[in-house]
Swiss-Prot record:
Keywords of the record: ATP-binding, Cell cycle, Cell division, DNA damage, DNA recombination, DNA repair, DNA replication, Ligase, Magnesium, Metal-binding, Nucleotide-binding
Protein name: DNA ligase
Biological process (GO), any one: lagging strand elongation
Catalytic activity: ATP + (deoxyribonucleotide)n-3'-hydroxyl + 5'-phospho-(deoxyribonucleotide)m = (deoxyribonucleotide)n+m + AMP + diphosphate
Active site: K246 (n6-amp-lysine intermediate)
Length: 552
């Protein structure tokens, strides 16, 4: 069993190391010494992932209440620490340093926290629901802070916020697993894309069984992604393509196991209970005994046209009153791929074969229409039809391409009328002036560096926010403020904005090296987590594409 103090010391050492290679070496050495049970947990913890695909549901106010109870400090004293540090981890560190003697014996008899203890406490927090769930979360956090040293408390708090702030992302953990257990980075990445669980990948790599990890029913896999197509004509340069509408909806991955149907969102979170009609559609219209299906759920109005994306998100977020909401925001299912059927993986089959299988097991009314053609004019016609129907554009897919989980490449291209929007994490905000003095009027945006997990800013957005939205957003972000500096505030990176813009420019003013010209808010993407924000690499690709440049 691994003491949590050892894990906290690892995080502290990594945070004080600047180079990615050095960080990889430190982490690889640590992972190689762990037993399998602890290894699986630590590989996730170091990225701020406690349970893959599951949010803990701990907000800043709940965290600070737990710290206050565990240390005996008043709420005002905890808030003063927050104003001074702007970091939940440092708040916990300093609060535990000042912990009142009475609280030290509150949970006597402990021999110190272990990684397994902390994991089980967070598991209880994640499972808490319904009446009394907030108190369950507070008490579990209170227990951990009562038992923790200042350094342990620092990283318990950051785990609770799912933000470790040590510069470790998926890429670095992948490389560390490969180095620790003598396997290739490519094999680690393949296994991760098939399981969405680097902890599980690390465990199997240690056992020398990495090749045993594959696609499995009821375990979501990363979805194949599309990149931006330069134009219809350029996209058809290599021959015939499979053309489908790009629906204005929400991506879903559906796992059917006989009569049991589970639905996963783009974030690979289980949303089955929120989408009962999709579950029933699959039960009634898919004949395969077991299957993993890829598709889009679209909210439709009385005229058959898609409703705004925010309406779809209302369905995905809904936990209570689902039946009532389903009547006002009905969903249609459009399936476009099948990647597993009756015990066999279809990942390595070409798209045209996967399509044949899909058509053989699903009824036509739930399958997205597809036309295979090399005729530019026919594709343009389908593109115009999609836009006229209220959808986003078209997808152009290579008929001979395999399904590559988690990959964005030229085998799937999306053609839309405007520059591709970006999904960016909000990391700060600025108070307004005059009549908007009590409202947060503009928001600082960041992309993610996948190698380090760090957020790199790309500018601010204020356009596209109505007065009504200002009030709602202010309430949303007020809870997430971690530090104030004059008119500006730093917020916990939890909310993702979909942002449009005129172009991407090079800029030395932001840590990303890029800036958005004339950004505007399109939507608050509640269906996406910060880890799913657009990457620094992708912003660079869009910059080169809009300039007609090729990567050097």
């Amino acid at each position: 069993m691994t003491g949590f103090a050892r894990f906290a010391e690892l995080c502290e050492r990594i945070s004080q190391t600047s180079g990615s290679l050095e960080k990889t070496d430190i982490l690889a050495s640590f992972l190689s010494d762990l037993e399998s049970d602890d290894l699986r947990i630590v590989a996730g913890f170091v990225m701020g992932v406690v349970i893959p695909g599951t949010e803990l549901g701990v907000g800043p106010s709940l965290l600070y209440e737990s710290i206050s109870r565990a240390t005996g400090l008043s709420s005002d004293a905890v808030n003063e620490l927050l104003r001074a540090t702007g970091d939940p981890g440092l708040v916990a560190y300093r609060a535990v340093e000042r912990r009142k003697p009475l609280t030290l014996a509150a949970f006597s008899g402990s021999e110190g926290l272990e990684v397994q203890d902390v994991y089980q406490r967070f598991l209880s927090i994640a499972k808490a629901s319904g009446r009394g769930s907030q108190e369950i979360r507070v008490k579990n956090l209170q227990y951990m802070f009562s038992e923790a040293s200042p350094l342990e408390a620092k990283y318990i708090a950051r785990l609770a916020m799912e933000d470790m702030r040590i510069g470790v992302g998926e890429g670095l953990v992948r490389d560390a697993i490969a180095k620790a257990f003598g396997v290739s980075k490519e094999d680690v990445e393949r296994a991760y894309n098939l399981t969405n669980d680097l902890g599980l990948v690390a465990e199997y790599a240690k056992l020398g069984r990495l090749n045993e990890l594959g696609i499995s029913i009821n375990r979501p896999i990363k979805m194949m992604l599309a990149q931006i197509g330069e134009s219809i004509e350029a996209s058809l340069a290599e021959g015939a393509t499979a053309v489908e509408w790009k629906f204005d909806g929400a991506r879903v991955q559906i796992h059917k196991d006989k009569g049991n149907v589970r639905i996963f969102s783009r974030r690979l979170e289980d949303v089955t209970s929120s989408l009962p009609e999709i579950r029933e559609i699959v039960r009634g219209h898919v004949r395969a005994r077991t299957a993993i299906l890829d598709g889009e759920a679209v909210a439709t109005g009385e005229d058959g046209r898609p409703l705004p994306f925010q309406e779809i998100l209302r369905r995905f977020r809904r936990k209570y009153g689902v039946a009532r909401t389903a009547k006002t925001i009905p969903l249609k299912l459009h399936l476009f791929d099948i990647i597993y059927m009756d015990g066999a993986s279809l990942l390595d089959e070409p798209l045209e074969e996967r399509r044949r299988v899909l058509v053989s097991v699903a009824d036509p009314e739930i399958i997205a229409e597809q036309v295979v053609t090399s005729d530019v004019h026919r594709v343009e016609e389908i593109y115009r039809e999609a836009l006229a129907a209220g959808h986003e554009g078209v997808m152009l897919k290579n008929p001979s391409s395999t399904y590559t989980p988690g990959k964005r490449g030229k085998n799937w291209l999306k053609i839309k009328p405007l520059l591709e929007s970006l999904d960016l994490v909000v990391i700060g905000a600025r108070w307004g002036e005059g009549k908007r003095a009590n409202l947060l009027g503009s928001y600082r945006l960041a992309c993610i560096d996948t190698d380090t997990g760090e957020l790199k800013d790309v500018g601010w957005v204020a356009t596209g926010i109505t007065d009504e939205m200002l009030a709602e957003l202010t309430e949303l972000f007020r809870e997430l403020i971690v530090k104030e500096n004059g008119m500006e505030v730093e917020v916990h990176p939890e909310i993702v904005f979909e942002v449009g813009y005129e172009e991407i420019q090079r800029s030395p003013n932001y840590s990303s090296g890029y800036a958005l010209r004339f950004p505007r808010l399109i939507a608050v993407r509640d269906d996406k987590s910060p880890s799913e924000a657009d990457t620094l690499e992708r912003i660079g690709e869009i910059y080169r594409l809009q300039r007609g440049r090729s990567k050097k």
